[in-house]
């Protein structure tokens, strides 16, 4: 079974994170390790998650010169992560170099995903960094660039999923943050949708954090979400 739920681990300590992880089941979700936890806890923490049979999405959003990003992606592959991402605005050459370095790994290579427009960003945010386009227009532009580079898919908000399916086809993976079960606080993300809605319009993987990690019974919430999208 291809788990569609990716739980974002946003904890301050290893003990807190592992306490949560030990309450959930790798058959029900994958786990995302971001910049804060990876900077604090490093590869040892990732290996602890893998030892518990969880697939890991290493969410470090690489953005640097091509060789530096490629070597970082290779290190992620050597670590055995399931998915790794980079910023599409790093350009075509950066993404192509990262994809090429994964070729020797074959079927064991992690999924390589492009980050398009962060879900916290709106039209004004883009304009302030010199991009005179809507989030939708910029996502489409960057998704095309990712596809041209040979990436496996992109991170995009739920509102862009249907358009990207049309532009990029059914085999291009769409990883969707901004997912909040009904009744949840939207937090710092503005372009949001429920799990059921996102799957129905074609999302492949749903990134969900606090509604699961801060729940009194995270396993029950996880089971409920999985049931809603079954």
Curated annotation (Swiss-Prot):
Name of this protein: Orotidine 5'-phosphate decarboxylase
Pathway: Pyrimidine metabolism; UMP biosynthesis via de novo pathway; UMP from orotate: step 2/2
An example Gene Ontology CC term for this record: cytosol
Coiled coil regions in record: none
PROSITE patterns, sorted: OMPDECASE
Stored HAMAP family: OMPdecase_type1_B
Pfam families, per the entry: OMPdecase (PF00215)
InterPro entries per record: Aldolase_TIM, OMPdecase, OMPdecase_AS, OMPdecase_bac, OMPdeCOase_dom, RibuloseP-bd_barrel
Quaternary structure annotation from Swiss-Prot or TrEMBL: Homodimer.
Entry EC number(s): 4.1.1.23
Protein residues bound to substrate: 10, 32, 59-68, 119, 180, 189, 209-210
Keywords tagged on the record: Decarboxylase, Lyase, Pyrimidine biosynthesis
Gene3D superfamilies: Aldolase class I
Alphabetical list of PANTHER family matching this protein: OROTIDINE 5'-PHOSPHATE DECARBOXYLASE (PTHR32119:SF2)
Tagged with keyword Lyase: yes
Enzyme category, top tier: lyase
Similarity annotation: Belongs to the OMP decarboxylase family. Type 1 subfamily.
Function: Catalyzes the decarboxylation of orotidine 5'-monophosphate (OMP) to uridine 5'-monophosphate (UMP).
Organism: Glaesserella parasuis serovar 5 (strain SH0165)
Active-site positions on this chain: 61
Catalysed reaction, written as an equation: orotidine 5'-phosphate + H(+) = UMP + CO2
Gene Ontology biological-process annotations: 'de novo' pyrimidine nucleobase biosynthetic process; 'de novo' UMP biosynthetic process
Molecular-function GO terms, alphabetical: orotidine-5'-phosphate decarboxylase activity
């Amino acid at each position: 079974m291809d788990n569609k739920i990716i739980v974002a681990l946003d904890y301050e300590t290893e003990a807190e994170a592992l306490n949560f992880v030990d309450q959930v089941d790798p058959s029900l979700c994958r786990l995302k390790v971001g910049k804060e936890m990876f900077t604090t806890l490093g590869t040892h923490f990732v290996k602890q998650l893998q030892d518990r049979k969880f697939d890991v999405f290493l969410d470090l959003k690489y953005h640097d010169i091509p060789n530096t990003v490629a070597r970082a992606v290779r290190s992620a592959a050597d670590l055995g992560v399931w998915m790794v991402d980079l910023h599409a605005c790093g350009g075509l050459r950066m993404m192509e170099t990262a994809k090429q370095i994964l070729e020797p790994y074959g079927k064991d290579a992690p999924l390589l995903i492009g980050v398009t427009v962060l879900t916290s960003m709106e039209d004004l945010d883009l304009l302030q960094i010199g991009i005179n386009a809507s989030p939708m227009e910029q996502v489409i532009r960057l998704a095309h660039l990712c596809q041209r580079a040979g990436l496996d898919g992109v991170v995009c908000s739920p509102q862009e999923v249907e358009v990207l399916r049309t532009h990029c086809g059914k085999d291009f993976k769409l990883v969707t943050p901004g997912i909040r079960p009904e009744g949840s606080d939207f937090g710092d993300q503005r372009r949001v949708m429920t799990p059921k809605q996102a799957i129905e319009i074609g999302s492949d993987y749903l990134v969900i954090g606090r509604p699961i990690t801060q729940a009194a019974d995270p396993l029950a919430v996880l089971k409920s979400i999985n049931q809603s999208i079954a």
